[in-house]
UniProtKB/Swiss-Prot annotation:
The gene is HAK20. This is Potassium transporter 20. Residues 69-84, 193-209, 259-288, 340-353, 432-442, 491-496 are extracellular. It is found in: Membrane. High-affinity potassium transporter. GO terms for molecular function: potassium ion transmembrane transporter activity. The chain crosses the membrane at residues 48-68, 85-105, 172-192, 210-230, 238-258, 289-309, 319-339, 354-374, 411-431, 443-463, 470-490, 497-517.
Amino acid sequence: MSVQEDDDAAGPEVDRLRRHDSFYGDAEKVSNDKSHGTGENWARTLQLAFQSIGVVYGDVGTSPLYVYSSTFPDGVKHPDDLVGVLSLMLYTLILIPMVKYVFIVLYANDNGDGGTFALYSLISRHAKIRMIPNDQTEDANVSNYSIEAPSSQLRRAEWVKQKLESSNAAKIALFTITILGTSMVMGDGTLTPAISVLSAVSGIREKAPSLTQLQVVWISVPILIVLFSVQRFGTDKVGYSFAPVISVWFVLIAGIGAYNLAVHEITILRAFNPMYIIDYFRRNGKEAWVSLGGAVLCITGTEAMFADLGHFNIRAIQLSFTCVLFPSVALCYMGQAAYLRKFPEDVGDTFYKSLPAPLFWPVFVVAIMAAIIASQAMLSGAFAILSKALPLGCFPRVEVVHTSNKYEGQVYIPEVNFLIGVASVAITVAFQTTANIGNAYGICVVMVFSITTHLMTVVMLLIWKVRLPFIAAFYVVFTFTEFLYLSSILSKFAEGGYLPFCFSLVLMALMATWHYVHVKRYWYELDHIVPPDEMAALLARRDVRRVPGVGLLYTELVQGIPPVFPRLVDKIPSVHAVFVFMSIKHLPIPRVAPAERFIFQRVGPDAGHRIFRCVARYGYTDPLEGAKEFAAFLLDRLKVFVYEEAVFACQCAEDGGGGGGGDDDGVLRRAEEMAAEEKRLIDAEAERGLVYLMGEANVEAAPGSSLMKQIVVNYVYTRLRKNLREEHKALSIPKDQLLKVGITYEI
């Protein structure tokens, strides 16, 4: 039975009692729990701005530890080279983090969430670019789905939308660069702890010159091991104690920078003249171009501003960046350049050499803490991004532990933490110096910048509907700038740049494999859905018994009867008294309000069977409830649906009988009588037990498939599926209530 709404006939009392699901008009609007607009009061914004200092800026704030040594690995050839490089770093900080991210990209958030997947989800709401065809009309009624169709006046946006939806190549390209960006962030996550901790610990050689670099490495390794070991406790346990530490760090580096500027050479301020950048390139040619790979390290961690937006708001990040981060690091870089003008031989360890002697130990301790916090922020960002990829079927199933009751984005992924931890320790031992790690570091950073630029261009065309000259200027300026940096970094590919690149490609290949088979499996089920007449014949068989209890059969399909159902009935010729085809569906939005979670439909014949379809909708940051809580909520909403269905049936009967709407109290009374028995039956069957049914699909490449497809499906995907988390564990389904049905899909 399908239920449809007739707004004109429904009385106010009926409207009040209806649940707003897929069969009743627009969903009830609820307010988003995070404000990212202008409505935030300034006291709250200032508080968030302070907190963001500790969470967002750890990485970019610790870059002064190693930027000059990475930019001048062979020493300073000419005193004015320092002015040119300083000018280059200042304008890089202004152009990419400040102009691009702080004042443009942050506004392309997905209901307050940022990052590569947030951009992809934002685009996918305005154009059907997702590979799995599980869109439903009612999804647009969810409160924070909030799409605005391109207006007829702006034909360009309609044209872009049409091209994206009609081109498989465009869909694949968008998805590919999205997972590449995610993979690059993961590659960045392996290098940030290594270079940050190693550069901070290296300062100890100033007071203990007898220590070798290898000994410094072995001091750094235990710190890294402790860092990765405590991830399971979550950042919330020490959370916003980060802000005071990083604030002290910024005060120290700004003060020391101002001191060096005043004591050594105040004229270094002429670096604000961009002509010194041109002079630097004229004087050094190819060497200047190669040095870009070191200079770009001054903006590592910039993507974290966007990825961590969900914890703060736009104004808070704009305030903390322009008033705290930029002045502090700019003063630090200017002070270091002023110091190096007098002592160019100290470029290999600029940060610690430029410290006033009495401040060495306090700064050393704070530097170690800041390096750990920088690593922590990068790891938290990597976990958060992957947790968004999981619900969209873009990453193999792994355990996601929510470490904070207050901040939903704070998660921990044990398998990924172990992988990054091993890689980070191995990189530290293998590369040993910050200069060597710096060669490998930049490639991930700049490629993520470039990917964001391309996705932002699509957002401007499709969603913001910005004028073409502005879009062209944005694309040309940032693509050209990022290409210059990327080309320089790639020149160091053989010196270490290959490492994060290969790591990212392997991770990307695993994500692509998982998603490819996931999509193919969905299409197979969609192509083999059970026709209604076959469903009726199946339930009418004499050997099919009606057994007590509630059965939940999990399926990815949001429409139709999955092919595993006939298999189940053949093996166990019985159907539960209350049977629900259960689909867990993730929408391309961060959150779905609990009131809008479920949509129901009655399916199959009524005779002796109560069979329903239920789609439970989640955002990509919504945690799944435990099995017990989920089942209780589901059955509660099912009883509400049964009641609303009865209300609607009575209302339709009243209208069909010429009552013209009739007495609302009479309608409700008849509805209550119709629904009471069915609600009692649902309660009774729930008391008798709940059984979870799942199809254990063995996916194989169809006969005649190419060798590559056989390898991807039969070996890579199968090995991933068997060695990673099982689906019932991801759903927290108790084993003693689980029944699996084996089935083979040839795709």
